[in-house]
């Protein structure tokens, strides 16, 4: 999020970020090293790592999708990415998700006709819509991990479009964006980042924007 990158961070937000990342990493280490023990509470809420939520598809860019410049239309790329993300969220939740928003749309490089294009979508965060709408930055189980049967849950999906060239063995990320879906009810797994860098990235993309109105 470019706006977030330019915004100064309050000290209390900085402290909260450190605590949040530490908690994420503690839980993800358990999920990685001792998966059979990776539960959150007496309800046996499941834990999954971000890599376990990946869905992909691969296709050749066709001339039917070109724009006036002779390159693949950006709206087509967004639609294909959205369809993959929707299918991913549906598979993950077991109930049809509702679209909330698309953000952090980044067109980095053009896609040419004939390019081999891979779309990859994975979940980076699952939480309640108002999980951080509070006047305090205390790290609580209820705003980080707790799941429930009759509450709304937001599923945040990271989507990338990647041109892969088998001849040069050089993949290029051409597009990336975030999509948020919402589902109502059901006990969803908690999705955890697998590295400290990934945890910081999730905080900046998902958590910090929810706190930016407090500054």
Residue ranges: model-predicted function:
Residues 1-74, 87, 212-213:
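Catalytic strand-loop segment that frames the active site of acyl-thioester-processing enzymes
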Residues 103, 122-124:
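Conserved positions in beta-strands of structured domains
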């Amino acid at each position: 999020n470019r706006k977030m990158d330019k915004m100064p961070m309050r000290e209390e937000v900085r402290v909260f970020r450190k605590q949040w990342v530490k908690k994420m990493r503690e839980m993800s280490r358990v999920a990685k090293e001792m998966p059979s023990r990776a539960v959150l509470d007496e309800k046996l809420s499941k834990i999954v790592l971000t890599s376990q939520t990946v869905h992909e598809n691969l296709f050749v860019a066709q001339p039917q999708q070109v724009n006036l410049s002779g390159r693949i239309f950006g709206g087509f790329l967004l639609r294909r990415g959205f369809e993959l993300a929707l299918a991913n969220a549906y598979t993950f939740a077991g109930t049809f998700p509702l679209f909330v928003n698309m953000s952090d749309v980044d067109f980095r490089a053009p896609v040419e006709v004939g390019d081999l294009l891979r779309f990859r979508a994975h979940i980076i965060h699952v939480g309640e819509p108002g999980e951080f709408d509070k006047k305090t930055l205390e790290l609580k189980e209820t705003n980080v991990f707790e799941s429930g049967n009759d509450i709304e849950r937001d599923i945040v999906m990271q989507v990338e479009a990647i041109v892969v060239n088998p001849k040069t063995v050089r993949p290029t990320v051409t597009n990336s964006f975030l999509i948020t879906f919402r589902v109502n009810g059901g006990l969803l797994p908690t999705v955890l980042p697998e590295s400290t860098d990934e945890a910081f990235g999730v905080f900046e993309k998902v958590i910090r924007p929810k706190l930016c109105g407090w500054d």
